[in-house]
């Protein structure tokens, strides 16, 4: 292996940084996401304006300021952030301690290149993440967001296989439906046929197995037997592909927008872990959305201690929307082998950025000091009770599911048959539009052109209080009163 620049991207909890990863620096570009090929309203784009993918919203308000779980537009209208943006703003908006940490670091310096220097903020953040992640999660590799974190796990897994004498292992299994990011490597393990049609020719689409859906279950199964079937499919496909060719299996332990806060039966996690162990397959948890306290524990993986993953990708809540930030969390047993081989062949210009790191330290300090993980667990129970009560009164809410303050509300045309609305109705996006007009932000998705259903995320910031849950439910109830009156 040729020699290259060596970069200390990782640090362990409570100890000196391990020998640095080798790095090949790359530039980064802004990402944009295409949700599907189906017809839906798209924003008007004028010359010189910002360009984003249309998601069913024809005109987006311009936000002026934000505080707590609310933000205000330039016309003075207030919105309750019912989905924490894109399930990112975990500690709410306008936190003064985060702002002060941001200012203090910016006064000192905002950037150094990780091929040559480190910073106190970066080392502190790495230690905090590893300590919160717990035993077996020794090292942290900082990046700028979720897609980059996923890419890092895939590349570390592959390099580990090569340096340990397993070069044939290159196939990464994932679930359908599923979502792991917008970059090409992350898209290759995303279970979305619409995206595959567009981007498949420029990437290597990885094998998929069914996700253990809990609402739309095939005939002849119940929740538990279908979850068993899905786990068995993992083993069957490993044998079909050739066990010595399978590198990893990636999944969200608690689903994000692609599956609507899917939580499988406990037995599924232990069975998947045993299958991966049996065939030498690395288990990767995508905790970009469900990590950083969102489900009531720092990692969603902590709910299943008997089935911990080998690698974790985390983002969103790590910085709570205050800066682009993500992380790969890895054990020494994997990192050490790669480091000993000459270093990790990966990196980004902004990996370990000092300003983002200082913000991350402040955000995680708030998460711990304000006991927000416990609040997520406690308020999540209350919110699901209230959502289920609304479901019982509603003609178009088919299911409520989730864990902590990561929840989804599934929208159907017919509750008896679970039939979805026609694509032309754009039901979940219309519900979001009504909610926004009432002063409530909810994050919606029609998964794979509706093949797997449509829903919105009920995932407010972890700081939410009971009176604020009351207001959330008042606005959501009115949203569905209007929505259902339009669809009688």
Residue ranges and their predicted role:
Residues 8, 17-19:
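Short, low-complexity intrinsically disordered segments enriched in A/P/G/S/L with frequent Arg
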Residues 23-24, 361:
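Short, linear, compositionally biased motifs with a strong N-terminal bias
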Residues 33-488:
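Conserved N-terminal phosphate-binding loop of PLP-dependent enzymes in the Aspartate aminotransferase
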Residues 2-6, 22, 29:
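Basic polycationic patches enriched in arginine
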Residues 9, 24-25, 35:
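Low-complexity, intrinsically disordered or signal/transmembrane-proximal segments
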């Amino acid at each position: 292996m040729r020699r290259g620049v060596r970069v200390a991207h990782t640090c362990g909890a409570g100890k000196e940084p391990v020998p640095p990863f080798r790095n090949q620096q790359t530039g980064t570009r802004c990402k944009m996401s295409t949700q599907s090929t189906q017809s839906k309203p798209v924003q008007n784009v004028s010359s010189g304006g910002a360009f984003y993918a249309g998601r069913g919203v024809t005109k987006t308000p311009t936000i002026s300021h934000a505080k707590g779980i609310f933000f205000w537009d330039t016309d003075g209208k207030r919105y309750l952030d019912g989905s924490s943006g894109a399930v990112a703003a975990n500690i709410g908006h306008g936190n003064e301690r985060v702002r002060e940490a941001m200012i203090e670091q910016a006064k000192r310096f905002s950037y150094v290149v990780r091929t040559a220097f480190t910073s106190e903020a970066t080392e502190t953040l790495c230690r905090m993440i590893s300590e919160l992640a717990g035993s077996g999660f020794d090292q942290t590799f900082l990046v700028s967001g979720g897609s980059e974190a996923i890419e890092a796990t895939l590349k570390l897994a592959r390099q580990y296989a090569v340096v340990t004498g397993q070069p044939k292992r290159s196939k990464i299994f994932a679930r359908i439906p599923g979502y792991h990011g917008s970059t090409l490597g992350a898209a290759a393990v995303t279970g979305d046929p619409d995206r595959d049609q567009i981007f498949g020719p420029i990437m290597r689409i990885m094998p998929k197995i069914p996700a253990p859906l809990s609402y739309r279950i095939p005939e002849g199964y119940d929740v538990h037997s279908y979850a068993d079937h899905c786990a068995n499919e993992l083993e069957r496909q490993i044998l079909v592909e050739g066990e010595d060719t399978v590198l990893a299996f990636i999944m969200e332990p608690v689903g994000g927008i692609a599956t609507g806060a899917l939580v499988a039966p406990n037995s599924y996690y232990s069975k998947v872990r045993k299958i991966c162990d049996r065939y030498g397959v690395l288990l990767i948890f995508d905790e970009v959305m469900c990590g950083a306290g969102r489900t009531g524990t720092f990692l969603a993986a902590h709910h299943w201690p008997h089935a911990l993953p080998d690698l974790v990708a985390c983002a969103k809540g790590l910085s709570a929307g205050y800066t682009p930030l993500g992380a790969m969390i890895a054990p020494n047993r994997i990192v050490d082998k790669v480091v000993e081989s000459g270093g990790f062949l990966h990196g980004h210009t902004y990996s370990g950025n000092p300003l983002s790191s200082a913000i991350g330290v402040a955000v995680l300090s708030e998460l711990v000091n304000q006991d927000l993980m416990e609040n997520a667990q406690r308020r999540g129970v209350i919110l699901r009770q209230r959502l289920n009560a609304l479901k019982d009164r509603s003609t178009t809410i088919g299911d409520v599911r989730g864990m902590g303050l990561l929840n989804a509300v599934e929208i159907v045309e017919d509750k008896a048959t679970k039939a979805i609305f026609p694509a032309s109705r754009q039901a979940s996006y219309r519900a979001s539009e009504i909610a926004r007009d009432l002063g409530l932000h909810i994050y919606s998705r029609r998964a794979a052109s509706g093949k797997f259903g449509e829903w919105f995320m009920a995932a407010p910031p972890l700081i939410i209080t009971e009176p604020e849950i009351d207001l959330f439910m008042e606005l959501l109830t009115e949203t569905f009163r209007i929505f259902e009156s339009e669809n009688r």
